[in-house]
């Protein structure tokens, strides 16, 4: 999960209270969330939903409230449903959602699990951690088991880009300018607009040298 700034005004169509997923809503959400599912961080997912962060349950105000509409992939929306209705909010500027939950990437493309660990001991963080664990490690149906495996492989592919840069950065034969370029490329991988940025950010945060160097670039909403 990544930090988001909702810097777009409410799309005009919402004022009519007819549809909450008109084209202007989609366009605005795509910009605000960088075309990423706010839960799993998949970029440009094929199956997308306008999700109600708090289930509206027939409440017209919640149904058409711009601040309650989120960019979600169909899979995450299906798993979340109404059960997970008290999550930490990635659009809340008072909460650093990235640092609230540790994301550990899989060590191989077909690793059976990846680690999600709450860093704060409160109900919202624990529930969000539980949801993320289910998203990435689900085995509750055959379909979800297979799709979770595909998702972990995508995370690993992005992680592998970071591994290549780390190998270059820490090489005994690296030139100063090459080291600087590797560092700049790492900054691109931890930007909120990058896929699975939470996983790569945590790798950097836990590195004794790179953590202090890139700390100020991590978790900064775009």
Q: Which sequence ranges carry the predicted segments?
A:
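Domain-level detector of nuclease and nuclease-like folds
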Residues: 81-171
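Tryptophan-centered motif/residue detector
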Residues: 26, 66, 196-199
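DNA major-groove recognition helix of helix-turn-helix/homeodomain DNA-binding modules
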Residues: 76
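Short, charged surface segments at domain edges that flank catalytic/cofactor-binding sites
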Residues: 1-36, 58-64, 160-163
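C-terminal, charged low-complexity interaction regions
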Residues: 130-222
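Histidine-centered nuclease catalytic patch
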Residues: 18, 39-72, 80-101
